[in-house]
Structure formats: C-alpha cells, structure tokens
Swiss-Prot record:
It is found in: Nucleus; Chromosome. The gene is FBXO11. Its main location: nucleus. Pfam families: Beta_helix, F-box-like, NosD, zf-UBR. It is linked to Intellectual developmental disorder with dysmorphic facies and behavioral abnormalities: An autosomal dominant developmental disorder with variable manifestations and onset in infancy or first years of life. Clinical features include intellectual disability, speech delay, hyperkinetic disorder, hyperactivity, seizures, pre- and postnatal growth retardation, microcephaly, and facial dysmorphism. Defects in FBXO11 may be a cause of diffuse large B-cell lymphoma by allowing the accumulation of BCL6, an oncoprotein that has a critical role in lymphomas. It comes from Homo sapiens (Human). Residues 153-199 form the F-box domain. This is F-box only protein 11. Residues 7-16 have a biased composition (Basic residues). Changing residue 644 to C: Found in a lymphoma cell line; diminishes ubiquitin-mediated degradation of BCL6. InterPro entries: Beta_helix, Carb-bd_sugar_hydrolysis-dom, F-box-like_dom_sf, F-box_dom, F-box_FBXO11, FBXO11_UBR-box, NosD_dom, Para_beta_helix_rpt-2. The lineage of its organism: Eukaryota, Metazoa, Chordata, Craniata, Vertebrata. Residues 114-129 have a biased composition (Polar residues). Substrate recognition component of a SCF (SKP1-CUL1-F-box protein) E3 ubiquitin-protein ligase complex which mediates the ubiquitination and subsequent proteasomal degradation of target proteins, such as DTL/CDT2, BCL6, SNAI1 and PRDM1/BLIMP1. The SCF(FBXO11) complex mediates ubiquitination and degradation of BCL6, thereby playing a role in the germinal center B-cells terminal differentiation toward memory B-cells and plasma cells.
Amino acid sequence: MNSVRAANRRPRRVSRPRPVQQQQQQPPQQPPPQPPQQQPPQQQPPPPPQQQQQQQPPPPPPPPPPLPQERNNVGERDDDVPADMVAEESGPGAQNSPYQLRRKTLLPKRTACPTKNSMEGASTSTTENFGHRAKRARVSGKSQDLSAAPAEQYLQEKLPDEVVLKIFSYLLEQDLCRAACVCKRFSELANDPILWKRLYMEVFEYTRPMMHPEPGKFYQINPEEYEHPNPWKESFQQLYKGAHVKPGFAEHFYSNPARYKGRENMLYYDTIEDALGGVQEAHFDGLIFVHSGIYTDEWIYIESPITMIGAAPGKVADKVIIENTRDSTFVFMEGSEDAYVGYMTIRFNPDDKSAQHHNAHHCLEITVNCSPIIDHCIIRSTCTVGSAVCVSGQGACPTIKHCNISDCENVGLYITDHAQGIYEDNEISNNALAGIWVKNHGNPIIRRNHIHHGRDVGVFTFDHGMGYFESCNIHRNRIAGFEVKAYANPTVVRCEIHHGQTGGIYVHEKGRGQFIENKIYANNFAGVWITSNSDPTIRGNSIFNGNQGGVYIFGDGRGLIEGNDIYGNALAGIQIRTNSCPIVRHNKIHDGQHGGIYVHEKGQGVIEENEVYSNTLAGVWVTTGSTPVLRRNRIHSGKQVGVYFYDNGHGVLEDNDIYNHMYSGVQIRTGSNPKIRRNKIWGGQNGGILVYNSGLGCIEDNEIFDNAMAGVWIKTDSNPTLRRNKIHDGRDGGICIFNGGRGLLEENDIFRNAQAGVLISTNSHPILRKNRIFDGFAAGIEITNHATATLEGNQIFNNRFGGLFLASGVNVTMKDNKIMNNQDAIEKAVSRGQCLYKISSYTSYPMHDFYRCHTCNTTDRNAICVNCIKKCHQGHDVEFIRHDRFFCDCGAGTLSNPCTLAGEPTHDTDTLYDSAPPIESNTLQHN
C-alpha cells in the first residue's frame, strides 16, 4: 500500500481539455472491394424497389474488420467498409461462414428511409455510431416500405454476441449506456454484468457491489443473491458522482482527458485534505472515495455533511488506513450533522504513548451539535490516555455501527457531557480500560454490541451516566461485565452478561439502573452485586450457573429484585447482608448447589411471592441479627430445611407455603426469635417446625399438617410461643417437647395425629393453656421421663388411648382442664385381658403398668404388659418397672417363651419409644 504524507495545500485545480481525436486505424493491406457510393437523402430520392432489383449484386462478404486496439478508438468507423459486408447471407455460402460463434436470430426487416451512411466518417462519440436510428423519409403521398441500411442491419442482427461484447468491453460507462439505447439486442448485451463488473472494479476497486440506496447507507452484497439483474451497474449509478483519493493517479487521470472522456463527474486527488476542499468548492454531493493506502498525519476536521468511504478490494477497511501521530485522527465539528465515514481503519498512534501534552487523545472525536455516521470502521489507539472514540457535548448524537473498536490501550468508547447517539452492531474487545464509558448525563442507545475480553470492565457507567443497552453480548472481561456507580442510571435490556472473571453486574456507591430480561450466567463471582446504598431494578432476568451466588446485596444495598429465574448457582441464589434492605418478589430460586436465599449480618428486606425450591441446602437462611420479612412465598422440595433461623436470626415469616422438605419445614435455633404466622407447613420428612438449642420464636395461626414426624418439636432449652395453630394429621405426634424444652402453648387445635397430641419428656416444662387436643389416634397428652408441665383450661377429648397420661414420678400443675369422652382403648384392652401390643403401632405406644420377668431373664430394655404378666408369666418372678409408655415385648415375640395372648406377631420393632429424634440441619458445615 502507498504511504502518503499530506502537504498543507489547497486542492489542485487542473484543467481538463476535451480528448483529441485519435488517428483512424489503417485498413487491411488488401481491402475489400468498395461499395458503390450513395448520395445523401437530401440530394437524391431513393430508387424504387424495381430499380433496386436491377442494380448489380455486391461481391461476396469479406472477413470482418479487425477489432480496435485502443479504448478511445472504439467509437471510430471505417469509411471503407463495403456495403456487401453487411448483406444478408444466403444459399450455400451461409454454411461456410468464417464465424463459428453464436448468432442472434435475424429480426424482421424494418421499414425505414435510407440515411447517411452509418459507417461513414470517424468520430470519437459512440453516440454517433450507435445512438441514431434510421430516419423516416418525408414523402408526399403513400409512404414506401424500405429495408434498413445494410451496416445497421448487420450490427443489430447478425454480428455475433461475442464480437459485440468484445467491442462493448472497450467502452466507458456513458457510451455503454448510449449503446443500450440502440435496440433491444444492444440493450441486453450492454447490460451484461461482466462488462459492468470490469468497469466497476476499475473505478471503485470493490470486489462486491457497494450499494448506496439512500444518504448515509452503504452495504456490500453478493451479486448472485441480489434481486436486481445487474447489481454492478446499479451500484455504479449510485456511486457515480464522487471524488476519489488515489495517490499518484490524479496526474494520470487529468493528463489523459480523451481516455477518460465522460467521467467529468469524477474528481481525483492525492490527499484527503485536498479532497475535502475540492468537493466543497466544486459543489459536489460530498462523496469521497479513499482508495487503498496508508494516509498519515492528515488534518481531518469535518464540519460539513460530506461522505467519506474506503474503496478497496476484499476487506475494504483493512486496505484503507488513516493514521495520526499528533492529534485526533478524525474530528467532527458543528455542521457535520449528516456526515458519513465508513469502511476504513482509523488509528491514533502517538510517538509518546503516555504524553499528557496532546491536545486530544482520540482516534475519533465527535463534538457538540453534530450527528455523523461512522460505519464499518476499524478503530485503534495506542495512546494510554484518552479514548479511542470520544463523543462529548450537548447535541453530539452520532450513529456508530458495524465498527471494530479493539486492542486499544485506553477506553474504547467514551460518551460524556450530555452526549447521546446510536451505537449498533459494534465489536469492542481487548481494550486496556473499559470497553464503554458513559459519564456525566451521557445517554446513548447501544444495541447488539459485542463487548468482550476487556482488560478492565466491559461497560462502566458513572457520575450520572445513563444509556439504553439492548441485546449486547458482554463476556470474558477481567472485572465486571457491567459496572454502575455514583448515581448512574442505565437501562440494560435483553443482554447476555457472562463468563466475567469477577462478577456479572456490579452496582455500587448509590448506583441505580434497570436490568431487564438479561441472561447473566457463568460469572466467577456473583451474577449481580448491589452495594453501598445502591438501588437498581433487576427484573425478568435469568441468573444461572454462577461460580458463586446469583444476586448479592450488601453494604446498605437496596433494589427491586423481581420476576427473575435464579438457578444452578454454586452459592446462594440471593444473599442479603450488612443492613441491606431490598425488595425480593416473584422470583424463582431453584436447583442451587447451596441455599436459596441467605440473609445474614443484620440483613433485612421484603421477600414476597417467590418460589424457592429444589436447593441443596436450606430454602431460606436467616442468621446473625437479620430481620427480613418473608411473605406469601412458596418454599418447597428442598434437600434440607425450608426456612432456617439460627444464631439470632429474626424476622417475620407469614402467609407462606412451606412443604415437602427432606428435613423440617422450619428450624429455629441459638437465640433466634422470628415471628411465624399464618403459614402452611406440610410434608416435612423431619417434622413441621423444629425449635432447638435455645431457640425462641412466636408461632401463631399456622396450619401444620401431614408431616412425617412431629408437627412441632421443642427441645434443648428452647422456649417458643405457639398460639392459635392447627396441628393435625401428622404421621407422628402433634407437639413433642423434650430435653429441657419449654414454651407456651396457647389456644392451639391439635387433632388427628398418629401419636400423642402433646408429648412432654426428659426434664421439659412447658405451659399448656386453653388448647383443644382431640381425635388423636393415641393419647391426648403424655408426660414422661421426669418432665413436668402446667396445664390450664385445656380441653382433651375423643382421643383413642385416653386423655391425660402421666408416667411414674411425674408431677404436673393442673387447673380448669376438661378431659372427657376419650375412647380409653388401653383400659378397655386391659379389662378384656388383651396384650397391649395389640393396640400398639410402630410409633404409638400405650402408657400403662409395665413389668419385667426375672424368670425369663428379661433385661432393662424389655417390658411386659400387665395382662401378659397375669397370663403368660403366671407364677414367674416378676418385677414392676413403672407406669410409662412401652410396647409389650412378650406380645412382640422377642422373649424366649411365646405370648399366649397376642397370637401371631404383627410387629417387628423393639425400639423404645421416645419419638425418634429430629435431624438437625448441617447447613453450617457449608458456610
């Protein structure tokens, strides 16, 4: 490529004389016989048909004359071409034609008056040769039918296509268009795409047609896929009137006016500066073609609506390079509202990469009140200050599309100071700083950009920067894919933000923004970070497969997290900490490798109407002084706990559906004191609610049912309050209190549970007040194993085994209780002499007097009911153990002698009943 250094000079004004007529080509050494001379029609009228037939026939046609050798000789004619050469061939001679080329079918002879010999005289204008049809004679009376001139007939009807095309290949575009006006055949041949492609590439160099259907719009096409039959000609017409910057060609062009006759609408210059001045002085449309080459240190300040486009074969932008080493390569100033620059490489390559004394540090600078179009450009900068593209100032509103802004040692695209603009389909990659900066009320529209592999953040909006980002692909940047800071407020819609080496979206220091319907995935840190009083809107996004969490809100962060699909992340789907208080609603948080929502370190927030399911750890964690409000969520199908309060976790859990967890629906431990009300908790494999290790809590108005173990567990010094709950249809007991558990149970309905409505054991001491315990399949209340209780105003009725059972050594405080209408199945079985094993089940054990038999060598772990002692062990050495809850080992068939009362054994368990202990969450092992 040529390297051109501009000279500061005015555009050269070169006179362009008309082309000089070339010398007529010499005829062959043995010219054919000359036809008889014809007189002009003005001097002699044409002979009648009878007289023409009497004339002497012409000699046989000679070979065709040689083709012209020079382009500017194509228009010349041979005065000595015989008329016989163009006579119609007939008879046997037609079969021995010297041409073995294809011919056009002869057209019907036209009726016309004879004209001046069309081959007579030489002229440089092809219009005179091919442009005139035969004139009709003006005669009085009836008109006569006369045949066309023989030469015209030969050219139009009999000359082979290949010969015509060869002749046409020497014509320039205007003469070719004139030839197309001669006849239908010439029109078809003159529009041959190969002819126009050759002309087109000679002028514009493009190897594919460059279409220019309207101002500011250029695009290349594949000719075979274009609907127009001749896209080369169509593009030629669209691009015809323009100036060309082609170093070294201008002198040749203006020195050969005859060779380029008809191209007066084309101007040629050696430098871009000359072309900019020339098109303005010549009042052209401002279309400038910059041909292949490297143009260095030109002063390109554009302040008019010019159009500048690269012109080169192959990949155009790679062949046309404009470079500056001192100041901004291109500067668009006020007045360049509709300017266009496209299909070229623009470089800023200063000698001192970090020099601070540069007046400007940009490849391309767009200033106030201008809206140019930058299209299909490659933009590079090696300067470590400034940016590759800078758009600044009120009214700066460019359109930058299909550009490649990459490998720059600074910011790729910088939009600031109220600038706007449309930026579409650009490739922005591998820049040392952010791919895009938006600052100080800049408000661009950025669509379908590919922003990747940056050595910093992908997009950085800060200091009140705004913008609308749509359908961008942002990935593999060293820091976050998208960063929002310091009151910036962008809108990001339907983008893909993924594979960030840190996070996906980072909003901090009072940043805002709307992030809507994006795909955020596979980032090394959180998909979305919100911190330090920031308040963005995160709506309708898919946030998945992150190497850490989904959404991470900390440091007084806020925000609306709504309608997102958050799944498959390595840590919690949403994490809220350190006084953060977001609104989290209508999200799906599922299939995480950790928990669903994790609120800790005094985190807050309103978490409502979410669906949290199928997570490996707890659906929701609340810990370390946090106080969120969880309302109307569906938390289900987890592999551990549904909602887990621990280490002083607080908050409100209300109106939620919590079901089908492998552990408990809710666990409360270690000083946690939540308010749990109006929830439905069912399907837990380890019970409904487990309160342990000094857990607290106010549990009110809940419905707790169909759990595999107890509806509510209270153990290990825990002291919750349960009011107005309905605890029913459990596959174990209603409420189990043991290991020093306490609590206030007030106004609850406890019914239809498989074991005791309330079981109190192992040094526990709860208060039961005004509860209704009924329709149980075992006892109403059982108190055993040195436990105590205060029972006030309870109603205990219609339970199968009985109302209240107290084991040996148990002392309770009772007041105003009503124990009535229970079925007393144990007493009835004893009175009928039945083995009490008959009324036991795998998990339901009757409370009565139990013994051991020394004769049968029973151990401390064996117990025998009173009827088996009387019948099966009559006369044996027996010992009373205590009045407590056992099943009969004699009836179960576990002793050496068979039971004579039980018959065939129907149970196979010898486990002592103390209600199988609940499984405590091991979530802490994963913190």
